Amino acid sequence: MTPMPRFAILRHETPPGSPRPLHWDLLLEDAGTLLTWALAESPAAGRPIAADALANHRTAYLDYEGPVSGNRGSVTRWDAGTFQWRRRSDREIAVILRGDVLCGEAVLTRADDTTPRWQFVVRPEA
């Protein structure tokens, strides 16, 4: 049986003067890499959050806490667990999260295929 894919949300503190301020990195395991978005705010169920698509990250970040290379700050785990794919297209990704903090359907949507800007929302379980 194939294990459930893993996810993590890392609180990413950046150094002063960094082009991207404090944010939360959403990491979804996919075929040996991590699909990654920078969330503008701390995730909270039911609240839409701006999310910028980033380059895929190494799977080591699922378990990593500490300094980020290149003087890019440091990360601490905010949440982690497993997830199940629900829907996946160029404009929408929906997963069921089973984390220590977040449980429910998480949906990433974007207006068109040309922008890296997405919107992230978690719909809590009833």
List where the protein language model places each region.
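A charge-rich, low-complexity, intrinsically flexible signal that marks solvent-exposed coils, linkers
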Residues: 1-126
